[in-house]
């Protein structure tokens, strides 16, 4: 292996600490070409699609990318913000807010973000940290619930980048925070604030709150992935915080891809069944997504909404993700701070003069 070129080591180096917030990724533009490039990287990850690569790559290159590239580009165009992709825009804002909050509390750390797929990538971010004199890095995936297809592959990419370094930094990882009290509080506050502005569902009349998490193939649960259980744990804690029963609130899973069985119940069919059963209002919230993106704005806000209304429902609400909510920025900063314990995160104070 050839290692990356590095400057000579120096005892006078900055010895800085870096916090890297890592999200899934996004195309650079809502165009078929950019979307195909992004999907090719994403769907080529063996952590994401556990099919023999020799077979999968033929299907991916000849069938899936040509068909999904153009269709997905139209969906991205429908949610694209003036500043860019929603996921990137919100992640940038979260990064700035966490940096500001930590700095205001006396933390002397660098805070940046990266994407597992697309740009800015993890390798580039770690290289920038190294050039700035960072010798300790906290990897903070923006996935509250652990899954091999999200959290583990994020760490894979980071360790691949570290493997090319001769002088590696000390590294810590945040595996999950599915049950962290500050995270649960931020979720509950997001729902409460939305209801304060738009009215609370009439649960006595049969209205429903649906907590929709991103789905994964069911076989991953059978193979030991803890994602399903952690989603259920988050859902139960959030229901308790909101004072709701399992009759009033349901955990579901969205974004199924392919014909294999995924975690159930599926979100869209559940909403249609609610409509057909006479449910008048349904609110959907996505606790596993810390920032709004295609899967929340388009899939939930448009496709799932249409399923509910087609089934006979009358009022649909998509509760925005945590995004830049103050409770979430506080929670995220708290989780980061807890995982920085033991490192010299605060600037050294001068010795008092006698």
Swiss-Prot record:
GO terms for cellular component: cytoplasm. Its EC number is 4.98.1.1. It is found in: Cytoplasm. Pathway: Porphyrin-containing compound metabolism; protoheme biosynthesis; protoheme from protoporphyrin-IX: step 1/1. GO terms for molecular function: ferrochelatase activity; metal ion binding. One of its GO terms (biological process) is heme biosynthetic process. CDD domains: Ferrochelatase_C (cd00419), Ferrochelatase_N (cd03411). It holds the Pfam family Ferrochelatase. It catalyses: heme b + 2 H(+) = protoporphyrin IX + Fe(2+). It comes from the Bacteria. Keywords: Cytoplasm, Heme biosynthesis, Iron, Lyase, Metal-binding, Porphyrin biosynthesis. Signal peptide: none annotated. PROSITE patterns: FERROCHELATASE. Fe cation binds at residues 214, 295. It is an enzyme of class 4 (lyase). HAMAP family: Ferrochelatase. Belongs to the ferrochelatase family. Catalyzes the ferrous insertion into protoporphyrin IX. This is Ferrochelatase.
């Amino acid at each position: 292996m050839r290692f990356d070129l590095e400057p000579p080591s120096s005892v006078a180096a900055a010895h800085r600490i870096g916090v890297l917030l890592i999200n899934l990724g996004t195309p650079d533009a809502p165009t078929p070409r950019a979307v195909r490039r992004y999907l090719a990287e994403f769907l080529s990850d063996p952590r994401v699609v556990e099919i023999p690569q020799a077979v999968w790559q033929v299907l991916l290159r000849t069938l899936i990318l040509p068909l999904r590239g153009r269709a997905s580009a139209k969906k991205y165009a429908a949610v694209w913000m003036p500043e860019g992709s929603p996921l990137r825009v919100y992640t940038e804002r979260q990064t700035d807010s966490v940096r500001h909050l930590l700095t205001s509390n006396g933390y002397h750390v660098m805070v940046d973000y990266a994407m597992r797929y697309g740009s800015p990538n993890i390798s580039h971010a770690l290289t920038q940290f190294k050039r700035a004199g960072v010798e300790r890095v906290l990897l903070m995936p923006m996935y509250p619930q652990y899954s091999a297809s999200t959290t583990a592959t994020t760490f894979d990419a980071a360790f691949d980048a570290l493997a090319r370094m001769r002088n590696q930094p000390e590294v810590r990882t945040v595996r999950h925070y599915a049950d962290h009290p500050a995270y649960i509080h931020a979720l509950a506050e997001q729902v409460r604030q939305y209801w304060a502005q738009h009215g609370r569902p009439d649960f006595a009349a049969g209205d429903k709150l649906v907590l929709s998490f991103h789905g994964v193939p069911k076989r991953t649960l059978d193979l030991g992935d803890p994602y399903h259980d952690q989603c259920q744990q988050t859902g139960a804690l959030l229901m308790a915080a909101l004072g709701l029963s399992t009759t009033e609130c349901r955990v579901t899973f969205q974004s199924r891809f392919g014909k294999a069985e995924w975690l159930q119940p599926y979100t869209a069919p559940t909403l249609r069944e609610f409509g057909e059963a006479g449910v008048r209002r349904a609110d959907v919230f996505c606790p596993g997504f810390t920032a709004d993106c295609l899967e929340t704005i388009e899939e939930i806000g448009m496709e799932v909404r249409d399923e509910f209304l087609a089934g006979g429902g009358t009022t649909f609400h998509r509760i925005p993700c945590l995004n830049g909510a103050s409770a979430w920025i506080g929670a995220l900063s708290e989780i980061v701070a807890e995982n920085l314990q033991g490192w010299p995160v605060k600037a050294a104070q001068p010795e008092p003069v006698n």
